[in-house]
């Protein structure tokens, strides 16, 4: 069964289209109007071996906030759609990614229970034109719409670009670990309860 998600989200502020394939080869086409966000989406795709197609048009003449958040929402929704009932996956993932002096640890659980614990200390307010406050907002949006429990810890680093890129790389590798199919599960849901909550379920 294909583990894919397709989302088209339209608001008064943005128009976002996302296609995601968890069993891809790391192919990425990202055009959000926010260059640094595009760069980070490529990290998720390349290091998570997730095929991503993302196109967004937003009110970036105001700032990047709405586009950044709505791309995160759509990515989270596409991820939840691709995972379905999470049957047969490893469920948990973790990775520590270095990038020169920066070191960031990510641990996650495809639990269906949204939670973000975030402790990046990014020194500069901007990387290029990108407001570094938006890093957390992106992950808040992903978590709330995918049902991930996500912990992000900065262990070292002084260069803002290195810290953020290490974070996205660690997230990608942890996500790959968690979402890969575990052959020993034989298609069973990875929970002692026999069920995992699905994002968006009432």
Swiss-Prot record:
Disulfide bonds listed in the record: none
Main location, first listed in the record: cytoplasm
Catalyzed chemical reaction(s): D-erythro-1-(imidazol-4-yl)glycerol 3-phosphate = 3-(imidazol-4-yl)-2-oxopropyl phosphate + H2O
Segments passing through the bilayer: none
Cited InterPro entries: IGPD_sf, ImidazoleglycerolP_deHydtase, ImidazoleglycerP_deHydtase_CS, Ribosomal_Su5_D2-typ_SF
UniProt-listed PROSITE patterns: IGP_DEHYDRATASE_1, IGP_DEHYDRATASE_2
EC category: lyase
Localization annotation: Cytoplasm
This protein's UniProt keywords: Amino-acid biosynthesis, Cytoplasm, Histidine biosynthesis, Lyase
Pathway: Amino-acid biosynthesis; L-histidine biosynthesis; L-histidine from 5-phospho-alpha-D-ribose 1-diphosphate: step 6/9
GO cellular component terms, semicolon-separated: cytoplasm
Source superkingdom: Bacteria
Any GO BP: L-histidine biosynthetic process
Gene3D superfamilies: Imidazole glycerol phosphate dehydratase, domain 1
Family to which this protein belongs: Belongs to the imidazoleglycerol-phosphate dehydratase family.
NCBIfam families to which the protein is assigned, alphabetical: PRK00951.1-3, PRK00951.1-5, PRK00951.2-1, PRK00951.2-4
Protein name: Imidazoleglycerol-phosphate dehydratase
Native source species: Synechococcus sp. (strain CC9605)
Origin organism lineage: Bacteria, Bacillati, Cyanobacteriota, Cyanophyceae, Synechococcales
